[in-house]
Amino acid sequence: MTKRQLTNIFMEAKRNKCDICVELTIPGQDDTEFIINKNKSIENKLEYYLKTYDSKLGHCRNNDIRIINAFAIDFYLGGD
């Protein structure tokens, strides 16, 4: 996955009023981790990811942390 692909996924989710799920590798952990970003935070989180991760989406301070997937979701907790 590239920064361009990540940006496209985030912008499509924003247009469709969906939330975003980002899948990452974490050091010392055999399985991946999923982070959910709500639609209201999409622009802010995308800006953070673009600043904090390199062109191949490895974390700038720890390359063992890597974004490997992102996709739009409809995340509902109840209430507002």
Predicted features and spans:
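Charged, amphipathic alpha-helical segments
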Residues: 1-12
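Acidic, low-complexity, intrinsically disordered interaction modules
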Residues: 18-79
